[in-house]
Swiss-Prot record:
Gene Ontology biological process terms in this record: translation
Residue numbers spanned by region Disordered: 100-123
Pfam families recorded: Ribosom_S12_S23
Self-association state and partner proteins as the record states: Part of the 30S ribosomal subunit. Contacts proteins S8 and S17. May interact with IF1 in the 30S initiation complex.
Family as reported in the entry's similarity comment: Belongs to the universal ribosomal protein uS12 family.
Superkingdom as given in the UniProt entry: Bacteria
GO molecular function, one term: tRNA binding
PROSITE patterns: RIBOSOMAL_S12
Protein name: Small ribosomal subunit protein uS12
InterPro entries the record matches: NA-bd_OB-fold, Ribosomal_uS12, Ribosomal_uS12_bac
Keyword field contains Glycoprotein: no
Length: 123
């Protein structure tokens, strides 16, 4: 336990919480332009070709973003919306692209969990 004199000389430090998504700068989403669209393989126990794009955000950050869902229409210079949320088996991928907004199309033929993939309600 610190004495009162010690606390007067050097007060207690506040613990600063580190952000999981620093590039968003406390915003819910950010807009950006794709600089590279590619596939990459996940960490050890899993096996797949995960779709990822490198995005230059409007605030100057350059981040990797995961493209969820089956099939996508993104290419270089596509304008995308980025939200937070990491992909556990892809190191360095801490953001998701928002499907169905800006240049990103929704997932075709999706009937369940449609709101997460930007799919309109089937007639």
């Amino acid at each position: 336990m610190a004495t009162i004199n010690q606390l007067v000389r050097q007060p207690r430090k506040r613990i600063v919480e580190k952000s999981d998504v620093p590039a968003l700068q406390n915003c819910p989403q950010r807009r950006g332009v794709c600089t590279r669209v590619y596939t990459t393989t996940p960490k050890k126990p899993n096996s797949a070709l995960r779709k990822v794009c490198r995005v230059r955000l409007t605030n100057g950050f350059e981040v990797s973003s995961y493209i969820g869902g089956e099939g996508h229409n993104l290419q270089e210079h596509s304008v995308v919306l980025i939200r937070g949320g990491r992909v556990k088996d892809l190191p360095g991928v801490r953001y998701h692209t928002v499907r169905g907004s800006l240049d990103t199309s929704g997932v075709k033929g999706r009937n369940q969990g449609r709101s997460k993939y930007g799919t309109k309600r089937p007639k």
